[in-house]
Amino acid sequence: MNTVIETNIFSAKAAKVWTPKQYEDFVVYIASTPNAGEVVPGSSGVRKIRWGKDGAGKRGGVRVIYFNSAAKETWLLTMYAKNERENIPAHELKKIKEAING
């Protein structure tokens, strides 16, 4: 099981979208299945997973962007609703990951 770490951006967005129970369910799931999401091509291993929210299934839910470090940490970078934006460009995700890894 991975340790889950979240950025301030992710925390703020999750608080607006999920109930505490939905948040807890996601964190438990991603900690135990860190490779569940698809690797975003060209992002150096950043992953995207679809997750439902109240009143919407996965298709109408959110996309969570994260990556797994070699230290068995899962970093939750950001999240967005599909109706907000389709995708985040891979080069932006790569920059975020590099900033966290130093």
Where are the predicted features?
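A short, surface-exposed loop/turn module that caps and links secondary-structure elements
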Residues: 28-58
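Residues that recognize and position ribonucleotide moieties
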Residues: 3, 47, 86
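Arg/Lys-rich, positively charged N-terminal/basic patches that mediate binding to nucleic acids
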Residues: 1-21
